[in-house]
């Protein structure tokens, strides 16, 4: 009886799976997009049996070598394709039909809600329009002071370990600095993450970021119901961290809103709320922009604002952390490049290590910018981007079926020898002004591109230039510790740390 019932259920599942995939298979074949063998129900899942997070990149390179830069995928109940083809990437990133994020980002909803990273359609468009002024030139100019002050704190704390022989993992170091920067610029508050790393909010951000990275790579942690079943204590820990972050953000929003309302009630305007106790104008934060904004004449709710502030806390600290750490790693292992950066920094900023930087001075660090761009080419902070195609869509001359999940392989596209000769080599001069225009814009997309490009990329570049130039002014970076082992995740990390040594500079 049970055997017969099982046979009926299995036959039904197989028939359903075949019918569901038949149209996809036909359309992908007609589009010339091939992929590895797909099995009933499980699709390509057997490919992952002998893989780990640190071998996934190599596996994807092998698939590209065998099937080309567009690879059909079927994973359990999902169908779609991966692409490292710059022309296909251009078609996807440029189209209004393909701006919807796929379920790759569902793990972030508990923390970020429906903020700019995840939101779709009209809500995304309206929020993007509201937030864009937060990155106006004048506001960014004010933020440089924060970058400079927090990076100064970072280097002062590093002197204790700068003995020329201690291995330093730069990821947690850069993480606390980036957290201080984004908290002050997004919320207008000092959380002193570098000085008080045990502060509840700091611990909660660190915990949530690490646990989300783990959930991304562990199939049993992908869904909340499997987390409840197999990892109930971890889920409770994550939920506690998210609650702590939400409580802190809500308290800051409430306090700032009350300040704004009081200023208006006293006969002033919204700008009056930006004055401190002695009448000096405070630095405007992203939170201030959101509090002063309206949609259809109505102000944003506290929940609306929290979604965006939390989104910037996540995107604004983890991505720059990865880039700063990998750039330090590469400078330590390429002394000739480090020497050029150091000389440029001395020429532009001078020999006073305590002299503050300005937006103008950072703009003159042209070679350092090339170094950061080349670091982002080799180690993009966001190694993959997920999109969802909800209706039949022509992309790069290929008709792609509806209900397709697309994974854009940024890491692989930026190591494409068709666009980057000697792609594994660290060559910052690829991005020099003399070679401007040689790189196809969609072969290099560390900040994404098109309508859903990174809204804070100028902010990020200024922060990275400020932080790394400060490091180079104070220390010689040394090639100590294990080589990096990049691991596929929402944000690029390394299983071996991102290591270097430091020796104080004397000049």
UniProtKB/Swiss-Prot annotation:
GO terms for molecular function: heme binding; iron ion binding; monooxygenase activity; oxidoreductase activity, acting on paired donors, with incorporation or reduction of molecular oxygen. Its EC number is 1.14.-.-. Its main location: endoplasmic reticulum. It is a peripheral membrane protein. Its cofactor is heme. InterPro entries: Cyt_P450, Cyt_P450_CS, Cyt_P450_E_grp-I, Cyt_P450_sf, Cytochrome_P450_Monoox. It is found in: Endoplasmic reticulum membrane; Microsome membrane. It is an enzyme of class 1 (oxidoreductase). It comes from the Eukaryota. It holds the Pfam family p450. One of its GO terms (cellular component) is endoplasmic reticulum membrane. Heme binds at residues 315, 454. Keywords: Endoplasmic reticulum, Heme, Iron, Membrane, Metal-binding, Microsome, Monooxygenase, Oxidoreductase. May be involved in the metabolism of insect hormones and in the breakdown of synthetic insecticides. Belongs to the cytochrome P450 family. This is Probable cytochrome P450 4d14. It comes from Drosophila melanogaster. The gene is Cyp4d14.
């Amino acid at each position: 009886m049970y055997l017969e019932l099982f046979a009926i259920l299995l036959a039904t599942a197989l028939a359903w799976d075949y019918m569901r995939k038949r149209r996809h298979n036909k359309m992908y074949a007609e589009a010339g997009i091939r992929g590895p063998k797909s099995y009933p129900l499980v699709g390509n899942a057997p490919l992952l049996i002998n893989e780990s997070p640190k071998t996934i990149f190599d596996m994807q390179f092998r698939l590209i070598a065998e099937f080309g830069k567009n690879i059909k995928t079927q994973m359990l109940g999902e169908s779609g394709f991966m692409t490292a083809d710059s022309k296909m990437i251009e078609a996807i990133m440029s189209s209004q039909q393909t701006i919807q994020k796929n379920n790759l980002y569902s793990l972030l909803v508990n923390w970020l809600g429906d903020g700019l990273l995840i939101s779709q359609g009209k809500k995304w468009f309206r929020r993007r329009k509201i937030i864009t002024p937060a990155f106006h030139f004048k506001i960014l100019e004010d933020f440089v002071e924060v970058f400079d002050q927090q990076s100064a704190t970072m280097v002062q704390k590093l002197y204790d370990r700068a003995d020329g022989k201690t291995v330093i993992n730069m990821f947690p170091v850069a993480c606390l600095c980036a957290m201080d920067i984004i908290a002050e610029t997004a919320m207008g508050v000092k959380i002193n993450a570098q000085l008080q790393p045990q502060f509840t909010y700091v611990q909660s951000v660190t915990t949530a970021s690490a646990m989300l990275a783990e959930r991304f790579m562990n199939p049993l942690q992908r869904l909340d119901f499997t987390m409840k079943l197999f990892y109930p204590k971890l889920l409770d820990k994550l939920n506690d961290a998210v609650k702590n972050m939400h409580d802190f953000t809500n308290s800051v929003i409430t306090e700032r809103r009350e300040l704004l309302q009081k200023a208006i009630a006293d006969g002033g305007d919204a700008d009056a709320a930006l004055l401190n106790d002695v009448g000096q104008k405070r630095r405007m934060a992203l939170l201030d922009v959101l509090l002063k904004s309206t949609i259809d004449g109505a102000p944003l709710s506290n929940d609306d604002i929290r979604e965006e502030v939390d989104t910037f806390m996540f995107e604004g600290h983890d991505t720059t952390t990865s880039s700063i750490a990998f750039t330090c790693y590469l400078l330590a292992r390429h002394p000739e490049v480090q020497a050029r950066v150091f000389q440029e920094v001395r020429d532009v900023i001078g020999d006073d290590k305590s002299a503050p930087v300005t937006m103008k001075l950072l703009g003159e660090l042209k070679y350092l910018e090339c170094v950061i761009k080349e670091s982002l080419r080799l180690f993009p902070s966001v190694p993959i981007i997920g999109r969802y195609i909800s209706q039949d869509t022509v992309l790069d001359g290929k008709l792609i079926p509806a209900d397709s999940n697309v994974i854009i392989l940024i890491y692989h596209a930026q190591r494409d020898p068709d666009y980057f000769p000697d792609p594994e080599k660290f060559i910052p001069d690829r991005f020099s002004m003399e070679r401007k225009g040689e790189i196809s814009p969609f072969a290099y997309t560390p900040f994404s591109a098109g309508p859903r490009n990174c809204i804070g990329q100028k902010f990020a570049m200024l922060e990275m230039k400020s932080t790394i130039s400060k490091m180079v002014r104070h220390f010689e970076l040394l090639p100590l510790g294990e080589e990096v082992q990049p691991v596929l995740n929402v944000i690029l990390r390394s299983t071996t740390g991102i290591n270097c040594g430091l020796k104080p500079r004397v000049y």
